[in-house]
Amino acid sequence: ALHFVGHHVDHELVENIEADCGDRLERMREGEPRRFLLTMGGAGAQRELFKAVVDHMVPMVRSGEATLFVNLGDHRENWEWLEAELGSIRSEVHLHTTWDETRELADELRTSSTSGIHVFVYDNTFHAVYATNYLMRVIDVMITKPSELAFYPVPKILNERVGGHEAWGAIRSAEVGDGTVETRTIPETLHAIDLLTREEDLLTMYADGIVKNKAIGIYDGAYKSVALATGTVW
């Protein structure tokens, strides 16, 4: 049998949707720097786009418009590449390399403001992957290609696909109202960053959409799969 169960999402993300989206809108109303999380896959694809996003956001970070979190996963070669590309900007970057440090920072950000550029790189695959999930709750917008992260309940800028099948991740996110359509060029991605930083309507729409999606079960896929596997009722 084939069952449509919804998006597969970690329990703590689904459970805290209302609180986390409320915090995003409160930070926006208070004029705090917009918090962006930029993710890079292990293959290190899209380096030109990645560097363009960082370069574009440096002045925004310096002016207090935005804070940038960059998760490079467990591939240190990606950090070595980015560090070389940063040049003089390197002195402005806060590097985080352990899970304990990441967790402490994220926990602080639930109740405090933040600034600057923060880069995360690990020597452990599990820490590398889960850092994105853990940081997701305390950021305002995630910038990612439309892979599996396109289905997560966080406002998203979906940049150009790498695999052809990823087009559907962006389509789905746009359908349910929790992220942009696929921004197929670097200028489109940078324009989306500007809009989500300097305007309030898109972030409000995505946050409200995520809360509504939870109410109708869109993010209940993992729960329903377990129920089907165990013969229980969800």
Where are these regions (language model features)?
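Short, aromatic/basic amphipathic alpha-helical patches
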Residues: 1, 80-91
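A nucleotide-sugar donor-handling region in carbohydrate enzymes
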Residues: 1-55, 71-76
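Active-site/ligand-binding-proximal alpha/beta "capping" segment
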Residues: 11-26, 35, 126-135, 140-141, ...
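Residues that mark the start of a beta-strand
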Residues: 35-37, 67, 155
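Glycosyltransferase donor-sugar binding loop
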Residues: 67-80, 97-100
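Donor nucleotide-activated moiety binding/catalytic core segment of transferases
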Residues: 92-150
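C-terminal amphipathic helix plus adjacent low-complexity
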Residues: 109, 195-234
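Catalytic binding pocket for nucleotide-activated donors in carbohydrate/polymer assembly enzymes
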Residues: 142-200
